[in-house]
C-alpha cells in the first residue's frame, strides 16, 4: 500500500511510514511539501520562543553555557558578542534551521545513494534520495510542536532555551548532566527524535531496496553510530 497524495504522506509518515515511503518513491514534488512543513513549523517554534522569552534571562543562560572554561577576558568578549546579536538571534536561528535541514539532507542523500548501490536493483537518483532524507527528518515537526506547547504553557517568561528545544534529549530525559561536563553537549545532541529518524530510515530503505530489516537498520543507524562514537571518544579523552 502507498499514500495516495503528498498530504496523506504527511500523516502516514507517523502512523504508517511504509505507506508514505511507497508513495514518495515515484512521486514528483511530494518532498517539497515535507521540507516546507518542517521549515515552517520549526521557524514558528523559534519565533514563538523569542517572542515570549525574557531576553536578559536568555542572554545570561547563553553566556553561562558558553563561558564555562573561559578566562575573564574571554568572558567579557563572549557576553558582548551575545548582547550585540540578541536582537537578530531569532532571524539567524530561523535561517539556520532551514539551511541546516537542507544541508544535512544533501549530505545524507549522498550516503543513501552510495549504500543503495549495494542493491543491484536500486536505481534511484540523488534527487530521490534527497527527498527520502527529508521524510526521515519529519520527527522534527513533532519536536517543534512540543517546543511550542512548552513555551505557550510556561508560567513565566524566564524559559530555558535548552529545556524547550532539547526536551527530548537523552540528557534532559535521563542523565541530567550540567554544562561543562565532558559529555553534556553529546547527550544534549542525542535525541529521541533522532532515534525516530533512524527508524524511519530503516523502514524507507526496506521499501526502496531489497535490504533485510537488519541491514536496513544498520545502514540507517551507521552515520549516527560513527558520529557519536567518535564524539564520545574525544569527550572521554
Where are these regions (language model features)?
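Hydrophobic alpha-helical transmembrane segments and adjacent short intramembrane/lumenal linkers
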Residues: 127-237
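A generic alpha-helix surface/boundary motif
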Residues: 15, 109-113, 198-200
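Short juxtamembrane and helix-loop transition motifs at transmembrane-helix boundaries
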Residues: 2, 92-93, 179-184
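Short, membrane-interfacial amphipathic segments enriched in basic
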Residues: 1-15, 85
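Short, exposed beta-strand "edge-strand" segments with a Pro/Gly-rich flavor and a Y/T-containing core
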Residues: 12-13, 49, 64-69, 117-124, ...
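Selected alpha-helical membrane-embedding segments in polytopic membrane proteins
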Residues: 6, 19-23, 27-142, 148
Amino acid at each position: 500500500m502507498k499514500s495516495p497524495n503528498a498530504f496523506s504522506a504527511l500523516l502516514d509518515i507517523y502512523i504508517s511510514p511504509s505507506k508514505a515511503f511507497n508513495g514518495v518513491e515515484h512521486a514528483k514534488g511530494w518532498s517539497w511539501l515535507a521540507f516546507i512543513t518542517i521549515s515552517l513549523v520549526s521557524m514558528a517554534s523559534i519565533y514563538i520562543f523569542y517572542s515570549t522569552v525574557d531576553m536578559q534571562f536568555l542572554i545570561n543562560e547563553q553566556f553561562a553555557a558558553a563561558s564555562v572554561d573561559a578566562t575573564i577576558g574571554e568572558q567579557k568578549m563572549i557576553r558582548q558578542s551575545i548582547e550585540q546579536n540578541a536582537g537578530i538571534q531569532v532571524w539567524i536561528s530561523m535561517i539556520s534551521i532551514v539551511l541546516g535541514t537542507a544541508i544535512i539532507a544533501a549530505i545524507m542523500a549522498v550516503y543513501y545513494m552510495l549504500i543503495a548501490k549495494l542493491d543491484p536493483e536500486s536505481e534511484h537518483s540523488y534527487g530521490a534520495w534527497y527527498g527520502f532524507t527529508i521524510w526521515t527528518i519529519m520527527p522534527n515537526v513533532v519536536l517543534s510542536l512540543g517546543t511550542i506547547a512548552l513555551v505557550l504553557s510556561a508560567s513565566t517568561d524566564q524559559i530555558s532555551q535548552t529545556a524547550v528545544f532539547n526536551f527530548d534529549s537523552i540528557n534532559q530525559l535521563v542523565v541530567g548532566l550540567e554544562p561543562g561536563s565532558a559529555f553534556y553537549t553529546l547527550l544534549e545532541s542525542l535525541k529521541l527524535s533522532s532515534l525516530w529518524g533512524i527508524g524511519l530510515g530503516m523502514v524507507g530503505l526496506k521499501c526502496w531496496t531489497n535490504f533485510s530489516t537488519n541491514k536496513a537498520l544498520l545502514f540507517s543507524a551507521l552515520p549516527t553510530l560513527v558520529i557519536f562514537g567518535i564524539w564520545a571518544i574525544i569527550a572521554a579523552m
